[in-house]
Each structure stands twice: as C-alpha cells, then as structure tokens.
C-alpha cells in the first residue's frame, strides 16, 4: 500500500517515514540546523499525524547512549540527531561504543546550509553557517559507522531511510550516519508518496555452513580438552540457552573473556571464569565464539597442537 503526505516539507515526510518504520524515539540535541525538524514535530503534534516522540537531550553523548540503552532493552534501533559538525564530534564517544558493541543506531546530524543568497528555504541566515562548513563532514564518523550518506534530494528519501535501517540491522549490526542539510529538509512539496510497509526485506540471519558444523562436531567428539571462549555471544539472548546446553552435554568449559553480555550463567557448572590464559596450554580444541581478542599473543597463546575454530 501507498501512503501520501500532502502540502508538507521533506522533514514532515522524514518524520512520517521514521514512525512508519517503527522508530519510536527521536533523541536530539538541537542547533540552527534543526529548524525544519522542529517545525515538523510541532505540526505533527498539532495535527495528530504520526512521528517519533521527540526527546530533547542536553548532551550528545547522553543522547547516543539513551538510544543504545533503548535498543539493548527492546531490540529496536532509534534515531539520534545532533548539531552539524560540533554535535557530531561530541557524540563520537557514543558512536565508538555503538560500533564496538555492534549496536544499531540511526545517527544523524544537520549540515550547514549550502545557499548563501536567494530565497531558497533553509538558506544561510547566521554568521556561524560559514565557519561550520566542512569539506567532508561524514569523515568525522566514517571509521565508526557501517554506512554514511548525505541527503540531497527528496526523491531518494524513502530509499535512504530504508537503506539506513537495513544496513544498521544487518549482522554484524552497527551505527550508520546521515547528514541532513537544511535546504532539502525545508523543501516543500504538494504530494509525497511512500510504500507502507517498507519494500525492503528484514535482514535475515546468516546460516552456518552445515559441512563446517559437521566438522566441528567431529572435532568436539575427538577432543580431550575442548574449551569455549566467548565475549559477545549473549548479545542475542537466544544464544544463551544453547551455549549452556552444549557446554553441559559435552562437558566443555566456557570462559567469558572481557564479556559485555551474559553469555553463560555464572552458576553454570561449566563456567570457568573470565581469563583464558591459565587454560590455553591444556586445550586441544578452542572454539572462539563471538570474541574479538580471545588471548593476547605476546602474553599467552594456545599450544602448537591446538585446533582453533572461530564462530561469529
């Protein structure tokens, strides 16, 4: 089905699209770039049209971590918007955390206007709009995000929103970065159509190679001292039970090294603690499950006869 917005602006359509795609909250730390967005929130409230709930947050780092916390509880990514380059710079600590923890967030910022003269909506109207100009604002966040894009035309708005959500939610999950200049956001239209629900399929979970799983099963059966080292397998709560069952059934000790999530209950009989170093010499099979650094080679490494299998 197609939904139509009449007599609006691109920022009206942007908020409507976010709401339609399941975005509940819009965490913002505003500046002059937010003018079209603020008008659209006011219009949505007055008319009762769909839009995420606006949350004004006093610091960018807090805004990012509110979105990360919401995802941790609900499994649904949210939107954060900050003020041009300075807001982006202030938010980078949170974006690094999102990237490190594979947490999807639709991170966005305004961009100083392009237009210096004329009557185009959103044009430069303050002195600060000149010093805020950057050659490549996306470069501030590019190393920490899965994808970045600058919106230049309403014709691609639906595609950009859907692609942003799709990329953020595809494993391994993580943040994306959108820059939103004032002129496109303030652009008016008589009619804007978008598809609801999205034409983009929900990202599916990658399926392991059955032959590789068979080989691993054979190695487990023949191992004398197998060991599992994990860190983030518990990011998916559905993985906790199977790991507990596997380690219990085959008596495989589990180490949660630098864990950011609960991967195995601490009272499980096969819970071997949080440091892998004391056990590397004895293991003849190590299964590394969703762990970035299972050991530090300059400190301790597995023995020469040990087989190492990575899963993640």
Model-derived segments and their meaning:
Residues 1-312:
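N-terminal alpha/beta PP-like core and its mobile active-site loop of ThDP/TPP-dependent enzymes
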